[in-house]
């Protein structure tokens, strides 16, 4: 995926999923925490842009990753969240 001058790619290395970012001359590999138990590639749930900030939301079976990219300062924040199950109950 190519977005706002940033190339985004998911790869599996050493049994863990990584998000590879290529921002011009700089390349960054972000390991997706807790992804070693996930065999299928995480899917892009949403990609949003707010001013100069990119917000990526990835989903895989029981986990979500929220990745915030600040291209101007090349800072990246990655947060791993468990999926929430909604259970309906008859009353």
Swiss-Prot record:
Q: What family is it from?
A: Belongs to the orthobunyavirus NS-S protein family.
User: Pfam families in the record, alphabetically?
Assistant: Bunya_NS-S
Report the protein name in the record: Non-structural protein NS-S
- Offer one example of a GO biological process linked to this entry: viral process
InterPro entries in alphabetical order = Bunya_NSs (IPR000797)
Q: Which organism is it from?
A: Aino virus
